[in-house]
């Protein structure tokens, strides 16, 4: 028989616990002749229906749902905030979860279906996170309002589906006008689709919720910035085809982000849609400065061969440095050679400290053996108007 606990809750009868653990439906029905016995709980707050769901005893669950106590048992919540439905879904017991879902739907127990556990997850969150696509679609069909919930990490079902790359579920959720799309750390479902390179989901989001493409995460990155930094050219193309003005986003400039990762394909796609895309960060560093600093030789060559970006060769940052200054300062020998071969490169430019690229190079190495001779010998360029070789300029 059930006995009272210190908190006033009914402790589960040992025989009922044994029946639930073994899936013995016949013994459970015999015990159910005492009306209150089925409502007893274990110390974690689990009923016999919770226990049978946890252990995936499908027939035991079906038998309980035929009893008068079934509404109370289906609605019961354990100390983790789980209903039996949540207990089944969380553990990936799809068939048991489907049985409980159909029962709740038929009995119009919407609040049971919508219940969130102590971490804010509902049955749809858990089904998607475990990759159970058919169960997730069944849940959406039975109770579309599941799509509105976010957990304590601000994750919506749509965000989790996009992160898991489950296209069918994402598309179904997008059909629900009020479905949530937020994610952790300020991300949204479009960030997630971009991260996975899922052009199908990205295209659908752009059609139905185009404003998401301009939302920033906690690091101030929009889905556009993520597409560039993750080198997702196919997704970038989808975003730009929908709205080419996205190529002009600032903070940070997209060409500068592409320079950081050194992806020429991304830069080409950007310039294809936005031939005059911004190329300079707030401190005056161009994507050429950045590519040099990051050591991306192919990106440097791309810029040097680009009609749109040819003017960057002599541009100075906030310290008055050209890309050549940086290549010299950090001994980027191959880049020095490539920059030096530009006929329009002005090697006489002085930085804010009055120093030339040659000075930077000579002082970045052993003065007795200047590395400059390794970079197509720019140590003795044509003399500037002052008559002194560049490396002998007054500092």
Stretches with model-predicted labels:
Residues 1-395:
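Regulatory and partner-binding modules of innate immune sensors/adaptors
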């Amino acid at each position: 028989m059930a006995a009272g606990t210190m908190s006033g809750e009914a402790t589960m009868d040992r025989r009922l616990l044994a029946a639930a653990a073994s899936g013995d439906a016949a013994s459970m029905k015999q015990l159910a002749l005492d009306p209150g016995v089925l409502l007893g709980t274990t110390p974690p707050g689990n009923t016999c229906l919770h226990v049978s769901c946890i252990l995936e005893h499908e027939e035991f669950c079906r038998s309980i749902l035929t009893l008068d106590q079934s509404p109370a048992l289906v609605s019961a919540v354990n100390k983790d905030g789980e209903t039996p439905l949540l207990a089944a879904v969380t553990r990936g017991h799809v068939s048991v979860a489907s049985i409980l879902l159909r029962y709740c739907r038929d009995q119009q127990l919407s609040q049971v279906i919508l219940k969130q556990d102590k971490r804010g997850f509902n049955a749809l969150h858990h089904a998607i996170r475990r990759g159970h696509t058919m169960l997730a679609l069944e849940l959406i069909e039975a109770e579309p309002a599941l799509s509105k919930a976010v957990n304590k990490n601000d994750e919506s079902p749509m965000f989790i589906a996009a992160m898991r790359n489950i296209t069918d579920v994402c598309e179904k959720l997008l059909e629900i006008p009020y479905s949530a799309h937020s994610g952790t750390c300020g991300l949204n479902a479009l960030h997630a689709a971009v991260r996975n390179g899922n052009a199908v989901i990205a295209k659908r989001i752009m059609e139905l919720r185009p404003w998401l493409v301009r939302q920033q995460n906690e690091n101030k990155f929009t889905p556009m910035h993520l597409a560039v930094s993750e080198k997702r050219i196919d997704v970038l193309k989808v975003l730009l085809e929908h709205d080419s003005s996205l190529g002009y986003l600032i903070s940070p400039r997209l060409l500068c982000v592409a320079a950081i990762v050194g992806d020429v394909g991304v830069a080409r796609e950007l310039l294809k849609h936005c031939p005059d895309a911004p190329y300079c960060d707030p401190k005056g560093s161009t994507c050429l400065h950045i590519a040099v600093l990051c050591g991306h030789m192919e990106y440097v060559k791309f810029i040097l061969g680009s009609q749109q970006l040819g003017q960057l060769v002599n541009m100075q940052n906030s310290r008055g440095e050209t890309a050549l200054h940086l290549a010299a300062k950090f001994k980027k020998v191959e880049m020095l050679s490539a920059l030096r071969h530009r006929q329009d490169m002005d090697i006489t430019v002085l930085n804010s400290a009055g120093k030339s690229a040659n000075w930077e190079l000579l002082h970045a190495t052993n003065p007795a053996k200047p590395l400059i001779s390794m970079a197509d010998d720019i140590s003795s360029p044509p003399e500037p108007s002052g008559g002194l070789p560049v490396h002998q300029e007054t500092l």
